[in-house]
Swiss-Prot record:
<feature type="binding site">
    <location>
        <begin position="65"/>
        <end position="72"/>
    </location>
    <ligand>
        <name>ATP</name>
    </ligand>
</feature>
<dbReference type="InterPro" id="IPR027417">
    <property type="entry name" value="P-loop_NTPase"/>
</dbReference>
<protein>
    <recommendedName>
        <fullName>Formate--tetrahydrofolate ligase 1</fullName>
        <ecNumber>6.3.4.3</ecNumber>
    </recommendedName>
</protein>
<dbReference type="GO" id="GO:0035999">
    <property type="term" value="P:tetrahydrofolate interconversion"/>
</dbReference>
<comment type="similarity">
    <text>Belongs to the formate--tetrahydrofolate ligase family.</text>
</comment>
<dbReference type="InterPro" id="IPR020628">
    <property type="entry name" value="Formate_THF_ligase_CS"/>
</dbReference>
<keyword id="KW-0436">Ligase</keyword>
<comment type="pathway">
    <text>One-carbon metabolism; tetrahydrofolate interconversion.</text>
</comment>
<dbReference type="Pfam" id="PF01268">
    <property type="entry name" value="FTHFS"/>
</dbReference>
<keyword id="KW-0067">ATP-binding</keyword>
<dbReference type="GO" id="GO:0004329">
    <property type="term" value="F:formate-tetrahydrofolate ligase activity"/>
</dbReference>
<dbReference type="InterPro" id="IPR000559">
    <property type="entry name" value="Formate_THF_ligase"/>
</dbReference>
<keyword id="KW-0547">Nucleotide-binding</keyword>
<dbReference type="GO" id="GO:0005524">
    <property type="term" value="F:ATP binding"/>
</dbReference>
<keyword id="KW-0554">One-carbon metabolism</keyword>
Length: 556
């Protein structure tokens, strides 16, 4: 079979002006970035606000293997299948980060015959959103350091600046740096560090803002440092929220592209789900809901991370909650959760599927807590056997969850038709009655305990010394009514990445909290989750090249 990029490059793309007509968008409603990419205008987003929202389908997954379980691919294939059934459907997905593209993942725009196009552009610089976010973030860093240099009227303690610089690359050497070295004219020497751009609070803000006014307010509410007397310093104190909004005025507009089958796709924003809230922008999802009868969206990593955050953090900012949740499972991941070594995953092992099913079962039970119907999608791989598939289907029937095999990677829309029909049937027959897991009025401590015990299956939460101090401080600052965004490994329900399956009787330790007051949540740090990833021994970048005619090579 052809590689992803060979398939993508074999497709005759339609002009984006033709694609968007399918959902009632005219040429005057978009700003073109070449023939095949566009941004949606503020005017059009405002004009459709009165429209009744369509059906919303959230795609999530079990705890993944390092290669991922195909959520984006499944989301794309499901949307294509729904359109093939005659349902007016749009996609609302995240845009890839260049760091993982060059690192472990290669391309991140779907796969096989379920891709968004032009995949080379989407995976590289796209419409420049990542660069705008990086620039806004680092402009704020420069303005903070300039404030220190020019007299420090706000009394910022250089030892307590919590705002870091960012870069859209995996670069472990930049995790901790010293800035301001050389001489007094180079600034005030202090410790600093770099995060990856998608971990920036500005990325989260862009994805939760509802318009330019809301974007500016959220930027003003960012906490960047503390004074010598331990009081928080906000962006509004520096009076630069207007400048940051100006840098982001185009980046806030959702991007329009197409799938291989011509399904319109809004791709916008890309926070990671293990260190941020893991969902595409509220603007993209809300607009898709008001343009189409069905919107398919995804949340990063497993349902314990992305879907939990989608349902607790993003949904309150949307016109409606999901009508159905699709949990993607692969037999290779279930076997891994059942104790099979990575090198042996290709061998048939029905017993391991049974043991690993505990992971999928917990995710199904967790999503049902939110009172939204659940469907399981088995993402088919060549090594899957009939006996393993039959075993998994029987286990799903035991817990009364609908299950369908999907082969969208190999067969595109046709490979997703059975899943699409089941999802539509479930939506028609089972009305969602969305219920949030916790209330804003709960304390931060109560919210964390709720997530750990109700979603992760943990026994208790241990708060480290710094976290205990912060619980008191944050209550004094009025931040304790914000939602909690857990930073945790994606590979396990616990904070130990090697504890697979569905562990119980474990504790999770919160070592510290990070205020993201502009985004409107508090991050709880567990384990050794890094906000600046490193590259693997053999980076995906080593297989990439460009032909003499400018064609991209090796993007998977």
């Amino acid at each position: 079979m052809k590689s992803d990029i060979e398939i993508a490059q074999s497709v005759a793309l339609q002009p984006i002006t033709d694609i968007v007509k399918k959902v009632g968008i005219d040429g005057d409603d978009i700003e073109l970035y070449g023939k095949y990419k566009a941004k949606l205008s503020f005017e059009k987003m405002k004009a459709v606000e009165a429209n009744e929202p369509g059906k919303l389908i959230l795609v999530t997954a079990i705890n993944p293997t390092p290669a991922g379980e195909g959520k984006s691919t499944m989301s794309i294939g499901l949307a294509d299948a729904l359109n093939q059934m005659g349902k007016k459907t749009m996609l609302a997905l995240r845009e890839p980060s260049l760091g993982p593209v060059m690192g472990i993942k290669g391309g991140a725009a779907g796969g096989g015959y379920a891709q968004v196009l032009p995949m080379e552009d989407i995976n590289l610089h796209f419409t420049g959103d990542m660069h705008a976010i990086t620039t806004a973030n680092n402009a704020l860093s420069a303005l903070i350091d300039n404030h220190l240099q020019q007299g420090n009227d706000l009394g910022i303690d250089p030892r307590r600046i919590i705002w870091k610089r960012v870069l859209d690359l995996n670069d472990r050497a930049l995790r901790q740096v010293i800035v301001g070295l050389g001489s007094p004219v180079n600034g005030v020497p202090r410790e600093d560090g770099f995060d990856i751009t998608v971990a920036s609070e500005i990325m989260a803000i862009l994805c939760l803002a509802t318009d330019l006014k809301d974007l500016k307010k959220r930027l003003a509410d960012i906490v960047v440092a503390y004074t010598y007397d331990r009081k928080p310093v906000y962006v509004r104190d520096l009076k630069v929220e207007g400048a940051l909004t100006l840098i982001l005025k185009d980046a806030i507009k959702p991007n329009l592209v197409q799938t291989i089958y011509g399904t319109p796709a809004l791709i916008h924003g890309g926070p990671f789900a293990n260190i941020a809230h893991g969902c595409n922008s509220v603007l993209a999802t809300s607009t898709a809901l008001r343009l189409a009868d069905y919107t398919v969206t995804e949340a990063g990593f497993g349902a314990d991370l992305g879907a939990e955050k989608f349902l607790n953090i993003k949904v309150p900012n949307l016109p409606k909650a999901p009508d159905a949740i699709v949990i993607v499972a692969t037999l290779r991941a279930l076997k891994m959760h059942g104790g099979v070594a990575k090198s042996d995953l290709a061998a048939e092992n029905c017993e391991a599927v049974r043991l690993g099913f505990a992971n999928l079962k917990r995710h199904v039970e967790n999503m049902r807590q939110f009172k939204v119907p659940v469907v399981v999608a088995i993402n088919e791989f060549v090594a899957d056997t009939e006996a393993e598939i039959a075993t998994l289907k029987a286990l799903c029937e035991e817990i009364k969850v609908p299950v369908e095999l999907a082969s969208v990677w190999a067969n595109g829309a046709e490979g997703g038709l059975a899943l699409a029909k089941t999802v539509v049937r479930v939506i028609d027959q089972e009305a969602a009655d969305y219920k949030r897991l916790y209330s804003d009025e709960d304390t931060l401590e109560e919210k964390v305990i709720n997530i750990v015990t109700q979603i992760y299956g943990g026994k208790a939460v241990q708060f480290g010394p710094k976290a205990k101090t912060q619980l008191k401080q944050f209550a004094e600052f009025g931040w304790d009514k914000l939602p909690v965004c857990m930073a945790k490994t994606q590979y396990s329900f616990s904070d130990n990445p090697s504890l697979l399956g569905a562990p119980t009787d474990f504790d999770i330790t919160i070592r510290e909290f990070v205020p993201k007051t502009g985004a409107g949540f508090i991050v709880g740090l567990t384990g050794d989750v890094m906000t600046m990833p490193g590259l693997p021994k053999v980076p995906a970048a080593m297989a990439m090249d460009v032909a003499e005619n400018g064609t991209a090579l090796g993007l998977f």
